[in-house]
């Protein structure tokens, strides 16, 4: 029984505590919304609306003013008082523990206050836009009208230079005037925002007119005067050159000029109605195209002048080159009496003769083409440049062949001197072997030395042949020289190894009595030494000594100096 009573008591206390906490939370939220409502009431919205009274109260301005004032009156007189009543209802619901209804009503009140905030923000922003539009219009209209008057005067002053576009300028200026009149009308009616839009349109149009007044006169000069004059000059120059014998059909300049003239007429029509976008680039293209054609004609004239001078000189150069080849052949026949020339040299000279013959035929073709005016002079000049490269190549080949003949005797004397030096080298190496007192030389080295002497003998014998085949002599001398010098290097190395082997064996004798194995290895090293196997002798002696003394080879080398 007491447990039941105690449980009921606990539940009752818990309920009252929970209710007290919830009511406190609702009261706190009611106070917050009450402060928000009062903040809205205290805002200077009437002052913001009152700014509009300084404007012309008609049309759009008057309509907006009445709407804003009505909205504010509705907020102050109807909506916010209703919010006040709803806040009292929330407190009543909370006191009666009707928490769900209290929460729902609070959410509704908060949503209404948010809606009022959004409505007031839009209202204030619109008022600022309206007032600022009036101020901006009043500030800018003066400079816009000044620009209008300035452009009207410029259009009158430059009327002659505006050519056929003058009427279109008049229409654009009239359009600008109509826009400014519309601006005045909207301003007088209090439609300041509409007036601002019209003023921006007028400013943009006047800016276009100002830009066009700057560029159009110059464009007319280009299209009506400069370009036609240049095309006429180009046409006259083309006619004069054709009459002077220039072949210009390849360049198709006539058709290019027709296309440029068609483009000029098209641009002139566009300029008349002031459609100028990209026109300067189009005019630049026409002028660059004409400049390229003028340069093309100038290059043709230059090419003709160069050809007039170049052709006789090239004919003379070809004749001199043919004479040089004839002299080369005669000298070759003379040299063949003493020297045997390689077959390739004779074939090479025959090939040179064919090449010069082909160059002679090509030059005749170029002469005919030039005289009959079948090609442009610039293309003929290119042919001549290529032809001259071929002639230069032949001249270089003839000079090389001539130098080869001149160097034959020089090569012979050089070969004799080299053979003499090789003989002395062999004698020097033999004396070195005798002085070295080594037991002998390995069989492989003896064979190499014998091969070197044979190569030397072959070269000496070949140098005595008549007729002399100098190419073969040079090859044999080079072979003998390479082999003898290589043998000399191997010989010096072998002598040094023999001396080192002898020193190592002598050094090792101090350890001969240490063991039978040491004695045996040193004896084997001596046998290898006497058999001229010096590398093996060194290795065997070192193996015998190293158990007693490390790095013996380096020590012996140091002692031997």
UniProtKB/Swiss-Prot annotation:
Gene Ontology CC annotation, any one: plasma membrane
Keyword Coiled coil: yes
Annotated InterPro entries: EzrA
Residue ranges, Extracellular side: 1-3
Keywords of the record: Cell cycle, Cell division, Cell membrane, Coiled coil, Membrane, Septation, Transmembrane, Transmembrane helix
Main localization, broad class: membrane
GO biological process: division septum assembly; septin ring assembly
Compartments, record wording: Cell membrane
Function per UniProt: Negative regulator of FtsZ ring formation; modulates the frequency and position of FtsZ ring formation. Inhibits FtsZ ring formation at polar sites. Interacts either with FtsZ or with one of its binding partners to promote depolymerization.
Name of the molecule in the record: Septation ring formation regulator EzrA
Organism field: Halalkalibacterium halodurans (strain ATCC BAA-125 / DSM 18197 / FERM 7344 / JCM 9153 / C-125)
């Amino acid at each position: 029984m007491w447990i039941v009573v105690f449980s009921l008591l606990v539940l009752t206390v818990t309920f009252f505590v929970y209710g007290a906490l919830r009511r406190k939370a609702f009261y706190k939220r009611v106070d917050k919304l009450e402060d928000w409502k009062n903040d809205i009431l205290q805002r200077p919205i009437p002052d913001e609306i009152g700014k509009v009274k300084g404007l012309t109260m008609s049309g759009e301005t008057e309509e907006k003013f009445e709407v804003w004032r009505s909205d504010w009156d509705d907020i102050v007189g109807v909506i916010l008082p209703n919010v006040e009543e709803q806040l009292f209802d929330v407190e009543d619901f909370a006191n009666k523990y009707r928490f769900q209804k209290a929460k729902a009503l609070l959410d509704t009140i908060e949503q209404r206050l948010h809606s009022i905030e959004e409505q007031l923000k839009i209202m204030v922003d619109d008022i600022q836009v309206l007032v600022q539009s009036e101020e901006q219009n009043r500030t800018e209209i003066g400079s816009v009208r000044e620009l209008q008057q300035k452009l009207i005067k410029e259009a009158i002053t430059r009327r002659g230079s505006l050519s056929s576009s003058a009427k279109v300028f008049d229409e654009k200026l009239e359009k600008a005037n109509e826009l400014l009149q519309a601006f005045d009308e909207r301003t007088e009616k209090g439609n300041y925002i509409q007036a601002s839009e019209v003023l921006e349109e007028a400013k943009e149009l006047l800016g276009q007119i100002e830009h066009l007044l700057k560029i159009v006169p110059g464009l007319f000069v280009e299209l009506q005067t400069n370009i036609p004059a240049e095309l006429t000059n180009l046409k006259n120059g083309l006619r004069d050159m054709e009459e002077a014998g220039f072949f210009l059909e390849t360049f198709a300049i006539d058709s290019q000029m027709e296309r440029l003239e068609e483009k000029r007429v098209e641009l002139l029509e566009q300029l008349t109605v002031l459609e100028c976008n990209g026109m300067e680039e189009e005019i630049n293209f026409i002028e660059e195209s004409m400049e390229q054609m003028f340069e093309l004609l100038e290059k043709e004239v230059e090419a003709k002048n160069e050809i007039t001078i170049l052709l006789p000189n090239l004919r003379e150069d070809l004749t001199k080159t043919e004479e040089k080849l004839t002299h080369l052949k005669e000298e070759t026949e003379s040299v063949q009496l003493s020297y045997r020339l390689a077959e390739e040299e004779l074939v090479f000279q025959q090939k040179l003769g064919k090449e010069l013959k082909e160059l002679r035929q090509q030059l005749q073709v170029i002469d005919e083409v030039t005289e009959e005016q079948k090609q442009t002079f610039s293309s003929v000049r290119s042919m001549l440049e290529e032809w001259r490269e071929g002639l230069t190549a032949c001249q270089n080949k003839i000079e090389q062949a001539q130098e080869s003949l001149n160097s034959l005797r020089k090569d012979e004397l050089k070969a004799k001197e080299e053979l003499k030096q090789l003989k002395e080298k062999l004698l020097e190496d033999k004396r070195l072997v005798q002085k070295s007192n080594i037991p002998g030389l390995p069989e492989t080295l003896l064979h190499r030395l014998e091969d070197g002497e044979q190569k030397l003998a072959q070269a000496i014998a070949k140098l005595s042949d008549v007729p002399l085949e100098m190419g073969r002599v040079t090859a044999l001398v080079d072979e003998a020289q390479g082999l003898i010098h290589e043998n000399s290097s191997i010989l010096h190395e072998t002598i040094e190894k023999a001396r080192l082997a002898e020193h190592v064996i002598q050094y090792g004798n101090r350890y001969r009595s240490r063991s039978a194995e040491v004695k045996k290895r040193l004896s084997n090293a001596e046998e290898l030494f006497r058999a001229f196997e010096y590398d093996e002798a060194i290795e065997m002696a070192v193996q015998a000594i190293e158990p007693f003394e490390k790095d013996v080879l380096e020590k012996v080398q140091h002692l031997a100096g």
